[in-house]
Amino acid sequence: VIGGAECDINEHPSLALIYSTSMRFHCAGTLLNQEWVSFTMWDKDIMLIRTLCAGVLEGGKDTCLAHPCAQPLLPAFYTKVFDYIPWIK
C-alpha cells in the first residue's frame, strides 16, 4: 500500500506511522515482506537532535506525495546516518 493505493509486489516498502499529538513517543513500521515488519519507536524530543526536518509546520509542502504527507505540524524527518555508521557496521 502506498498512500492508500495498492502497489506491485516488491515495488516499494510500506511505512506506517502511529502517533498522537498528546504522546511523547512515536512508532513506525516498515513492511519488509509478507512475514516481516521492522518497527521502531522514538522519543519525539530526542529525535530533533540528529534529524533533518523537511516540510513546513503550516503543512502543504513535504518530501512525499502520499496521504497523510504535508499535514500541519507533521513534517517529514530524516536521520543523519553518518552518526550511526559504527552501529550499522
Curated annotation (Swiss-Prot):
Regulation: Inhibited by PMSF. Not inhibited by benzamidine.
Keyword Membrane attached: no
Enzyme class, broadest EC rank: hydrolase
Primary location group: secreted
GO biological process, alphabetically ordered: proteolysis; regulation of blood pressure
Location relative to the cell: Secreted
Tissue specificity annotation: Expressed by the venom gland.
Record EC number: 3.4.21.-
Ranges where the Peptidase S1 domain occurs: 1-89
pH effect summary: Optimum pH is 7.4.
Gene3D superfamilies: Trypsin-like serine proteases
Active site annotation, chain numbering: D45 (charge relay system)
Keyword annotations of the record: Disulfide bond, Fibrinolytic toxin, Glycoprotein, Hemostasis impairing toxin, Hydrolase, Hypotensive agent, Protease, Secreted, Serine protease, Toxin
This protein's GO CC annotations: extracellular region
Disulfide bridge map: C64-C69
PTM text: Glycosylated.
Molecular function terms from GO: serine-type peptidase activity; toxin activity
Record keyword Glycosyltransferase present: no
Temperature dependence: Optimum temperature is 37 degrees Celsius.
Other known facts: Negative results: does not have clotting activities. Does not stimulate platelet aggregation. Does not act on plasminogen.
Similarity comment: Belongs to the peptidase S1 family. Snake venom subfamily.
Chain's role: Snake venom serine protease that cleaves fibrinogen alpha and beta chains (FGA and FGB), but not gamma chains. Exhibits fibrinolytic and kininogenolytic. Preferentially cleaves after Arg and Lys residues.
Name of the protein in question: Snake venom serine protease rhinocerase
Source organism: Bitis rhinoceros
